[in-house]
C-alpha cells in the first residue's frame, strides 16, 4: 500500500495494513516539516492493492484520523510511527491483506529472511519506481543494528 496526495497516483510513503481500518506508517510521513506541522487526515489517501502506479488500478481509502506515537521526535526520528484510521474498511483479497505479526516477542527472527517492499527511489536521479519493488534481506539482531547506528535504536 502507498500513501498519496488526494487525486494523485505516486506514493510518497508506504505502510502496512494491520487491520481493515488501520495502517501502520512512519510518523515523518504524517508531518510536513516539523512536529508542529502535522498533516490533516484529508490530505492523505491510501492506495491499497496497487502494484503498478501507471495503471490506476487500486482501491483508494480516505484517512479519518492520524495517531502518532506521543514521543515521536521529528529531529532524530525516535518513535517514528503513526497509525492511520481509514474512513472505510479495506476488503481483503490476494492483493490486500494485513501483515503477519509475531505471536510472541520472544522470537526476534534474527537470521531469518524478510521481504522488504516499497516505491522508493531506484537510482541516483531520485526517480521513484512506478512498480512496487521488493528485496529479500536477512534479519539482523537488535544489538547489531544498535551498534551500526551508534546506539540510536530505541526499544
Task: Describe every region a protein language model picked out.
Residues 50, 61, 81, 86-87, ...:
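Chymotrypsin/trypsin-fold serine protease catalytic domain
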Residues 3-20, 76-77:
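A conserved glycine-rich beta-strand in the N-terminal activation segment of trypsin-fold
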Residues 19-22, 26-27, 87, 113:
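Conserved SET/PR-domain catalytic core that frames the SAM/AdoMet-binding pocket
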Residues 2-6, 23-26, 30-74, 135-136, ...:
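Conserved H-D interstitial segment of serine endopeptidase catalytic domains
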Residues 41, 77-79, 94:
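Short, solvent-exposed loop/turn segments at the edges of secondary structure
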Residues 7-9, 54-55, 73-76, 107-108, ...:
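Short glycine/serine/proline-enriched coil/turn segments at secondary-structure junctions
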Amino acid at each position: 500500500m502507498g500513501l498519496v496526495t488526494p487525486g494523485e497516483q505516486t506514493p510518497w510513503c508506504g505502510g502496512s495494513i494491520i487491520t481493515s481500518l488501520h495502517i501502520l506508517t512512519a510518523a515523518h510521513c504524517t508531518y510536513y516539516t516539523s512536529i508542529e506541522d502535522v498533516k490533516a487526515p484529508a490530505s492523505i489517501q491510501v492506495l491499497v492493492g496497487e502494484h503498478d502506479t501507471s495503471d490506476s488500478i487500486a482501491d483508494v481509502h480516505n484517512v479519518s484520523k492520524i495517531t502518532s506515537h506521543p514521543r515521536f521526535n521529528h529531529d532524530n526520528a525516535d518513535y517514528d510511527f503513526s497509525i492511520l484510521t481509514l474512513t472505510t474498511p479495506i476488503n481483503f483479497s490476494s492483493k490486500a491483506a494485513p501483515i503477519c505479526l509475531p505471536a510472541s516477542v520472544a522470537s526476534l527472527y534474527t537470521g531469518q529472511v524478510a521481504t522488504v517492499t516499497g516505491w522508493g527511489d531506484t537510482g541516483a536521479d531520485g526517480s521513484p519506481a512506478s512498480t512496487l519493488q521488493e528485496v529479500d534481506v536477512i534479519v539482523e539482531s537488535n544489538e547489531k543494528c544498535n551498534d551500526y547506528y551508534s546506539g540510536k535504536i530505541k526499544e
